From Swiss-Prot:
Principal cellular location given in the protein's record: mitochondrion
Entry GO CC: mitochondrial inner membrane
Enzyme Commission number(s) from the entry: 7.1.1.2
Organism whose genome encodes this protein: Syconycteris australis (Southern blossom bat)
Coiled coil, from the record: none
Protein name per Swiss-Prot or TrEMBL: NADH-ubiquinone oxidoreductase chain 2
Assembly, per entry: Core subunit of respiratory chain NADH dehydrogenase (Complex I) which is composed of 45 different subunits. Interacts with TMEM242.
GO biological process, one term: mitochondrial respiratory chain complex I assembly
Residue stretches spanning the membrane: 4-21, 26-45, 59-79, 96-116, 122-142, 148-168, 201-221, 242-262, 274-294, 326-346
Membrane topology value: Multi-pass membrane protein
Length: 347
């Protein structure tokens, strides 16, 4: 893609998200979502092939349906209140429809089916944008309407998302699908605490984006998309491959890595609010995520796949890609846990 066109498209994606996050008018929020959706379609189709075309079509149909539901909710709210302001309290019907629309945009269960399929059909760089930046706009609106959200609806979707995010990733060998199911599970954790403590949900979103960005960047550096190709990177960049495995354990939520912090804080917040069954179920289903990450770590580090002799010479060829941005990201993605007392004071 032409760099000038790509920069214009990326600027439109950023502008659309910022419009959603800063608007106090519901129509401008909807326009921001539409700008963002239409601008990201060329990014998804950056590598022109049938898989990317199919992925972009699935993404468009899902997001268009979600936008239609969002406009329906905005219209009902306008009929009831006569105001376009986002600061105006929502009535229960509007709140339910808007929550469903945002859940579809985020990929929460039972609207999660598009996330693994779309992520698998696009490039790693496009997948990074899809699973990180594209979560900001819906989460910001969810944050704004959090006092009016139907708690039972959101908690049920959260529990289903955590469970499906764990079950779905168990049988996968494609790294992009594993990251997609991990994203579904993380969204479930964030939305579970949204009605109790929205600020904590945003803090967890930041940690999730940090972990996912670092993992995707290491995949892009090694050009790895499957478990098999990940195991072959030992010959080329052994230190970076070790880092990838630690990052995956962090994404799975294994202490004392950074990924354990969001789960710890969310379980603590839910138990403070006399919710015992929900965090118990979430903690048990989180073991599924940890299991498939540990299995992936085991299969790539402790077992060697068959490889031809010329694979053993990969270490002689240095990568020309810049890696200066990776060390600080890796440190933050693995060693944030000691900062937890300070982060808890910020709430």
């Amino acid at each position: 893609m032409n760099p000038l066109i790509l920069s214009m498209i990326m600027a439109t994606i950023i502008l659309g998200t910022l419009i959603v996050m800063t608007s106090s008018h519901w129509l401008m929020v909807w326009i921001g979502f539409e700008m963002n959706m239409l601008a990201i379609l060329p990014v998804l189709m950056k590598k022109y092939n049938p898989r990317s075309m199919e992925a972009a079509t699935k993404y468009f149909l899902t997001q268009a349906t979600a936008s239609m539901l969002l406009m329906l909710a905005i219209t009902i709210n306008l009929i009831y209140s006569g105001q376009w302001s986002t600061a105006n309290p929502l009535n229960p019907t509007t709140s339910i429809i808007m929550t469903l629309a945002l859940a579809m945009k985020l990929g929460l269960s039972p609207f999660h089916f598009w996330v693994p399929e779309v992520t698998q059909g696009i490039q790693l760089s496009s997948g990074l944008i899809l699973l990180t930046w594209q979560k900001l706009a819906p989460m910001s609106i969810l944050y704004q309407i959090s006092p009016a959200i139907n708690m039972d609806l959101l908690l049920s979707m959260s529990l289903m998302s955590v469970a499906i995010g764990g079950w779905g990733g168990l049988n996968q060998t494609q790294l992009r699908k594993i990251m997609a199911y991990s994203s579904i599970a993380h969204m479930g954790w964030m939305t579970a605490v949204m009605t109790y403590n929205p600020t904590m949900a945003l803090l967890n979103l930041i940690i999730y984006i940090l972990l996912t960005t670092t993992t995707f960047m290491t995949f892009m550096l090694n050009s790895t998309t499957t478990t098999l190709s990940l195991s072959h990177t030992w010959n080329k960049t052994p230190l970076l491959t070790t880092t990838i495995l630690i990052l995956m354990l962090s994404l799975g939520g294994l202490p004392p890595l950074s990924g354990f912090l969001p789960k710890w804080m969310i379980i603590q917040e839910l138990t403070k609010n006399d919710s015992i069954i929900t965090p118990t179920i979430m903690a048990i289903t989180a073991l599924l995520n940890l299991y498939f990450y540990m299995r992936l770590t085991y299969s790539t580090s402790l077992t060697m796949f068959p490889s031809v002799n010329n694979m053993k010479m990969k270490w002689q060829f240095n990568s020309m890609k810049q890696t200066t941005h990776l060390p600080p990201l890796i440190v933050l993605s693995t060693l944030i846990l000691p900062m937890s007392p300070m982060l808890m004071l910020l709430e």
